[in-house]
């Protein structure tokens, strides 16, 4: 029974990522939940539990928006200078936290005030975010060093660090809705801007460069993302090495 259900889910998931969804999100989530109840150790969950933390590409904005319609909605977020962390929850319980290099930080991350140990979600959900030192927003290298020191030390204080969640890994919502859903679950999300036209990007880039945008964070750039999950999946299909629907700007 579980193997047949697992095959169905993998088939639906494959078609979704190819841009041809066969069922809606609610139906898919129910199938995942049923599989988890029947067989929580299914290979499907093992494959999904590989928490990817790829570095963002640093291409030219012209290349990023090439081929997009002028009214394609974009999201601008701060590129927080800290350490990337991926969280995994099963039936609302935080079960795993890893660093970009794959280190298991679960027990340490549970000490961070901004990371809820329990959330109201059934089944599997994986979340990406940044661990950083917010009080040092004018000293970016210090923020990253503080986060890295916390991860390395056997026993270190966590009260000076924060966690900002900005992505549901392998999620099905657009970026704006993903951020709002993360907020609803109790996570701190980054300040962000929605662009209704691709030509608005330069205005926000200049604001950040002139220290008039995202000043509440230790930033070393800004991140531009496609809002549409459908467009994100199209770009993922042609480039699996990193999420080409998100790009870091560091100038």
Regions found by a protein language model. Name each.
Residues 1-251:
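RNA/tRNA-interacting regions in translation and RNA-turnover enzymes
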């Amino acid at each position: 029974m579980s193997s047949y259900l697992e095959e169905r889910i993998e088939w639906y998931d494959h078609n979704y990522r190819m841009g041809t969804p066969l069922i809606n999100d609610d139906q898919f989530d129910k199938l995942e939940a049923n599989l988890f109840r029947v067989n929580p150790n299914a290979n499907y969950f093992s494959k999904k539990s590989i928490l990817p933390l790829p570095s963002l590409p640093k291409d030219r904005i012209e290349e990023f928006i090439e081929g997009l319609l002028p009214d394609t909605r974009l999201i601008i977020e701060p590129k927080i200078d800290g350490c990337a962390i991926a969280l995994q929850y099963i039936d609302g319980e935080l079960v795993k936290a890893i660093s970009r290099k794959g280190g298991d930080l679960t027990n340490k991350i549970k000490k961070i005030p901004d990371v809820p140990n329990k959330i109201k979600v059934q089944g599997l959900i994986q979340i990406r975010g940044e661990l950083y030192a917010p009080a040092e927003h004018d000293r970016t290298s210090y923020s990253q060093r503080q986060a890295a020191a916390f991860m390395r030390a056997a026993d270190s204080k966590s009260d000076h660090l924060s966690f900002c969640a900005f992505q549901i890994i392998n999620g099905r919502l657009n970026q704006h809705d993903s951020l709002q859903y993360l907020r609803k679950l109790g996570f701190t999300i980054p300040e962000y801007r929605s662009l209704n036209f691709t030509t608005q990007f330069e205005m926000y880039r200049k604001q950040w460069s002139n220290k008039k945008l995202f000043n509440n964070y230790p930033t070393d750039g800004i991140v531009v993302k496609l809002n549409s999950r459908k467009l994100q999946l199209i770009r993922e299909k042609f480039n699996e090495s990193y999420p080409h629907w998100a790009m870091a700007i560091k100038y």
